A protein has these predicted regions:
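Catalytic phosphate-handling regions of large nucleic-acid enzymes and associated NTPases
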Residues: 1-212
Length: 212
């Protein structure tokens, strides 16, 4: 006969909701401070690097790239991958772009990008740079969702992306909203900090006054 355990409903709900919230925050909604990417963005770049969809090569259909990401790395539906890729291309929303869409990319006035079957994409030179030293010796790798291949948990950071491009996302009970900052100011602030890790906040604010 199975043993029946007595538990407190409050404790059980708290534990389950906490685990779910952490999973959503870590695996879907929020960026990692180390490379500045959400999981779907990181997987898009990884797929493009693996398939040599780089700035110097011919662009491929967005539909092909979305299918590859969904089938191998990110089983959360094609629309979330397409939306993320279009957002990564939007120069009017990002200080630095990692992908470049060829075709109707949408507009600053709110026009939508064309359907994924009509437009093509490849990495920008900055996107290419994330392939530099992308190996298990440099960054941690884990098995993908069906354990058929490996994927990086973070990308080798080439820029302080989280500050430069900002981020927004809503998880379960957690949200983030970080504005974009001027890339030159951010890089100069990082250089100043590496030269003097006791630099004051006021001194850093003189170099990087605020969002851009």
């Amino acid at each position: 006969m199975e043993e029946i355990s007595k538990v407190q409903t409050y404790d059980e709900l708290r534990d389950y909701i906490s685990k779910y919230s952490n999973m959503v925050a870590k695996d879907r909604a929020l960026p990692d401070i180390r490379d500045g990417f959400k999981p779907v963005q990181r997987r898009i770049i990884t797929s493009m690097l693996v398939n040599k969809n780089t700035s110097s090569n011919k662009p491929v259909k967005v539909a092909k790239r979305v299918g590859d990401v969904m089938g191998i790395y990110h089983p959360h539906g094609d629309s979330s991958i397409y939306d993320a890729l279009v957002r990564m291309n939007a120069w009017w929303k990002n200080q630095v772009t990692t992908v470049k869409i060829k075709g109707n990319e949408g507009s600053i006035f709110g026009d939508n990008a064309a359907a994924m079957r009509y437009i093509e994409v490849n990495l920008t030179p900055i996107g290419d740079a994330y392939g530099y030293k992308l190996s298990p010796e440099i960054v941690p790798f884990v098995k993908n969702y069906d354990e058929t291949t490996d994927e990086p948990t973070i990308l080798p950071a080439q820029l302080p992306f989280l500050l430069i491009n900002g981020a927004s996302g809503v998880a379960s009970g957690i949200a983030v909203s970080i504005p974009t900052h001027n890339p030159i100011e951010v890089i100069n602030a990082f250089i100043a900090y590496t030269k003097n890790n006791k630099i004051s906040l006021d001194e850093l604010m003189e170099i990087m006054p605020g969002p851009d």
